[in-house]
Amino acid sequence: TKSPHVATSPRTKEIAEFIAASWKAQGLDTVTIHRYDVLSSNPRTVAVEMVAPVRYTPTLREAPIPEDPDTAQPGISGAWTSFSASGDVTAPGVYANSGNPSDYDELRRQGIDPKGKIVIVRYSNPYSYRGFKALTAEREGAAAMIVYSDPKEDGYGQGAVYPKGPWGPASHLQRGGIAYDYIVPGDPLTPGWASVDGAKRIPVSEAVSVPKIMALPMSHQDIQPILAALGGPMAPAAWKGGLPIDYRLGGAEARLHVRIDMQTDVQPNYVVEGRITGSERPDEWVVLGNHHDAWVFGGVDPSSGTATMLELTKALGTLAKN
């Protein structure tokens, strides 16, 4: 966790080598690092601006916290979503609650067509995976999707915010991927087979798990002026979040400009495999796994799991040796 380690970055190979060395020292029977060449998605440019009724440019970054010097480290990325499409669009903003299909049904009942709009959705209320929100927005014909963490679910509406408590501070961003891997799991270009060197790869345009909609996360601090300017009908009571504004559906008054340029190409990624062969049932498997890449430092996700896994393999290695 000493530095950011996004998937396919050079730092992730260092972490794979650290895990492999730890397992060898712990006494696992075999330890192997496997290289897979996978489709990688990283941002070159992510920009948002409100151009009407007033001009406003959000920071799209997390503010450093004086009590936590690590939040000021270089290399911390701003707002971005892996596997967002690239594009440049100016369109009206629309608030679509959690971005689930029933929310778009409600928008239409209110006379608002999401097609061609930039939809703003919440991470919760109720929860759904950001990739499902993106697919739903894409199917609805939206031009882009902004997903933000409302303080009602992750912020001062729940209690004290970091560093005084566990909840998200005002500028906190929830980065993540939106690949439709719940439809086709694994590397998008090798559906159903391993993404090893020399493997057949389909074109990105044919990969059903690669979104065709632009998407990015924002903090509730950044999104508040935009939500406050939306205008249009009042949102249903169940859609109201924790910001001190009138939650409206938008549709015409507020116009947003979103420009995203993603670098999408095939890059190496590393998987570490360690084995302890059973003495009584060597042909039966118990599989334990955890990813080791992270959106930033990964103190919670994934490194809490990595630390737990390393302690477990240490215990299992000791048992195997004895």
Task: Enumerate the predicted regions with their spans.
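Catalytic-core environment of secreted peptidases
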Residues: 1-11, 20-26, 30, 50-51, ...
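Noncatalytic luminal/extracellular "stalk/propeptide" segments of secretory-pathway proteins
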Residues: 2-115, 125, 163-165, 169-185, ...
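Short acidic, gly/pro-rich beta-turn/loop elements at beta-sheet edges
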Residues: 43, 58, 104, 129, ...
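Soluble metallo-hydrolase cores and metallopeptidase-like ectodomains found primarily
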Residues: 67, 71-106, 184-300, 311-314, ...
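Short, surface-exposed beta-edge/turn micro-motifs
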Residues: 91, 115-118, 142, 213
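Extended, regular secondary-structure scaffolds
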Residues: 132, 140-199, 205
